[in-house]
């Protein structure tokens, strides 16, 4: 697909600091015990409510038995000024979530929730798998936050809600809805590392319940070899995106949402022109991506039963890879459809439905890895208020997977709100349908992988307990969680140039806790967070002892201070500390160094125009200051680099302007 010209035209038309994720803001804002828990300060000030889209029950966030963390539009705007081109920074600074770089050559990354592998995280857009059922590692870097209204995060096994791709959790990107007046925004950004972004958003009511929006963007990044070793520490890319949306709502409560999206990107990394890797060969690494998708969601009253919900989507991604002298061309496609009926009484909410998803992969170069997974499913969910402050919830799903058989995924949750306290407990089970694309293969390609044989589904059990308290300007929460993963897929070395994918012999065990403290007063917000994760697995080989899971820091913490006044501007300071991480197959060290990340953001609003500047990684932490990225010899899986455990781009300064027109 050559979609660049059409994207350029559509983008031209569309263009005519830290997200301290509201972890269900764990307790009442009111000074009266028994008031609704978790109410957001901005909801009170503006008279708005945050309704969760990702759990099907459509409750207010404070009434959800399942813990849902929320990043609001205000917090999204802070991150939009820091990194307009993608959502990596937005989700990376949510407690318990880590964006892990999986390919130093191209900068690809995935989302790890509470120490679990990134492939277990389901990324949705308005509840639809528009970025694929099993999101590729580069997908995270290709989604701009321009038109996001909120981000919902469900941690832990969520297969009972969304099937096999949600073993570790769900991140649902909810788009902005047009208001009563037409509005438009344009943002121009440039960085000291040769990056640039131009994004635009246009939304307007159309009358008779109809409204529409369109988002477009052009993004660029120049390549850079910061340490002069001939290997590009920052990959180059050129990307265009466009996404129109159509909305309709009737007075009867029926609604319709439709969207199409397109993206094209060329990304270049590996060796610089004329430079070589240690064996004397050139090793350029490139990836060209074209993505097209479409999605539809509708709901309508179903007689006296309840509400009928219909959802469907289809996405296609074509890739053209180059790994040194090996070219790999492939296509990923995901088709999804779901129908459900939801009803409610005074104390009970129920949902029942059926779903179907097909995930397809076709490789022109290595057809032995082609697959087509088909998974029809039945699911149900019920929530019951035993008392005004006590709610129980149960959900279950049965997937009839074409490759991995029948899989049952249950989840139980409870919510108790005694006075200013909020207590949530949850436990669930889920599964994941393995594919060849573990992190190492995403980074190095399929050329050295043995054809898959005898792989079984990966399964996990998960439990969590959340206790929170809030009163006046203070709030805090403590979360403890534990997961056990059976049959985790990982690579095993067969020879110096071949690897195979196998299920781990023993369980991967993860346990940890999250702590959040926040203070708000007169436009000032100070948030402190701490995360502890203990993740262990069996080592490779017969009789190997247990070891810590690589690239999972046991300790990480953050402190964010932000002042904002609408119509004037904002200023924010963020400090994050990442502890030591176990490393694997790294000849330079077995454990990473701890490091600190400091950022400073400022914005001045001058009517319809705002000017902003952001300093990121002020301490100029860079992994290549300690060790090379390049390996002395190529790894059996085909990689030429060690794993990334610290920033690779060093200090970056970005700034620009934002224009707003119309709206309220």
Predicted features along the sequence, with ranges:
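Short acidic/polar hinge/loop motifs at secondary-structure boundaries
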Residues: 110-112, 128-155
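Short, acidic, small-residue-rich periplasmic hinge/interaction motif at the N-terminus
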Residues: 25-78, 118
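Outer-membrane beta-barrel signature, preferentially recognizing the C-terminal barrel domain
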Residues: 275-302, 422, 426-486, 493-520, ...
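Gram-negative outer-membrane beta-barrel transporters
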Residues: 385-392, 480-485, 504-585, 656-663
């Amino acid at each position: 697909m050559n979609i660049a010209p059409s994207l350029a035209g559509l983008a031209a038309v569309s263009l005519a600091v830290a997200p301290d994720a509201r972890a269900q803001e764990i307790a009442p804002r009111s000074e009266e015990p028994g008031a609704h828990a978790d109410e957001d300060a901005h909801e009170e000030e503006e008279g708005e409510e945050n309704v969760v889209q990702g759990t099907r029950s459509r409750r207010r966030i404070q009434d959800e038995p399942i813990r849902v963390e929320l990043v609001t539009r205000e917090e999204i705007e802070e991150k939009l000024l820091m990194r307009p081109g993608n959502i990596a920074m937005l989700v990376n600074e949510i407690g318990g979530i880590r964006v892990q770089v999986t390919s130093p050559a191209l900068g690809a990354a995935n989302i790890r929730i509470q120490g679990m592998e990134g492939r277990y995280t389901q990324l949705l857009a308005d509840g639809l798998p528009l970025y694929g059922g099993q999101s590729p590692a580069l997908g995270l870097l290709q989604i701009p936050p321009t038109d996001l209204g909120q981000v919902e995060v469900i941690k832990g096994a969520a297969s009972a809600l969304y099937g096999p791709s949600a073993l570790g959790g769900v991140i649902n990107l909810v788009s902005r809805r047009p208001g009563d007046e037409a509005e438009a925004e344009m943002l121009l950004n440039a960085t000291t590392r040769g990056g640039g972004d131009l994004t635009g958003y246009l939304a307007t009511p159309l009358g008779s319940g109809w409204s529409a929006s369109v988002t477009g963007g052009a993004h660029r990044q120049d390549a850079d070899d910061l340490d002069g070793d001939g290997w590009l520490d920052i990959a180059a890319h050129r990307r265009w995106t466009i996404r129109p949306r159509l909305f309709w709502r009737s007075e009867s409560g029926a609604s319709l949402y439709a969207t199409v999206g397109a993206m094209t990107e060329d990304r270049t990394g590996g060796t610089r022109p004329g430079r070589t890797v240690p064996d004397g060969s050139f090793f350029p690494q490139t990836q060209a991506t074209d993505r097209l998708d479409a999605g539809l969601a509708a709901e309508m009253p179903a007689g006296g039963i309840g509400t009928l919900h219909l959802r469907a989507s289809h996405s296609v991604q074509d890739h053209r890879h180059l790994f040194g002298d090996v070219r790999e061309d492939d296509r990923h496609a995901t088709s999804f459809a779901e129908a459900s009926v939801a009803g409610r009484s005074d104390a009970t909410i129920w949902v029942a439905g059926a779903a179907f998803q097909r995930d397809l992969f076709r490789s022109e170069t290595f057809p032995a890895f082609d697959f087509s997974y088909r998974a029809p499913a039945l699911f149900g969910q019920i929530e019951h208020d035993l008392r005004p402050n006590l709610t129980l919830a149960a959900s279950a799903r049965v997937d009839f997977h074409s490759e991995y058989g029948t899989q049952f995924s249950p989840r139980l949750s409870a919510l108790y709100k005694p006075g200013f306290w909020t207590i949530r407990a949850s436990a669930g089970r889920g599964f994941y349908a393995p594919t060849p694309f573990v992190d190492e293969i995403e980074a190095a390609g399929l050329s050295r992988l043995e054809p898959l044989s005898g792989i079984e589904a990966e399964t996990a059990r998960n439990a969590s307990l959340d206790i929170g308290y809030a009163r006046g300007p203070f709030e805090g929460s403590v979360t403890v969680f534990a997961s056990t993963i059976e049959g985790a897929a990982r690579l095993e070395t067969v020879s110096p140039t071949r690897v195979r994918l196998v299920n781990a012999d023993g369980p991967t065990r993860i346990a940890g806790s999250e702590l959040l403290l926040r203070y708000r007063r007169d436009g000032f917000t100070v948030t402190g967070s701490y995360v502890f994760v203990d993740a262990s697995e069996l080592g490779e080989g017969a009789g190997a002892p247990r070891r810590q899971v690589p690239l999972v820091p046991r300790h990480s913490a953050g402190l964010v201070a932000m002042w904002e006044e609408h119509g004037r501007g904002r200023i924010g300071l963020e400090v994050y500390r990442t502890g030591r991480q176990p490393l694997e197959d790294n000849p330079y060290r077995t454990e990473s160094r701890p490091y600190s990340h400091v950022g400073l953001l400022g914005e001045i609003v001058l009517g319809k125009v705002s000017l902003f500047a952001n300093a990121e990684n002020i301490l100029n932490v860079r992994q290549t200051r300690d060790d090379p990225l390049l390996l002395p010899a190529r790894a059996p899986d085909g990689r030429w680099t060690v794993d990334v455990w610290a920033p690779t781009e060093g200090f970056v300064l970005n700034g620009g302007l934002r224009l707003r027109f119309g709206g309220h």
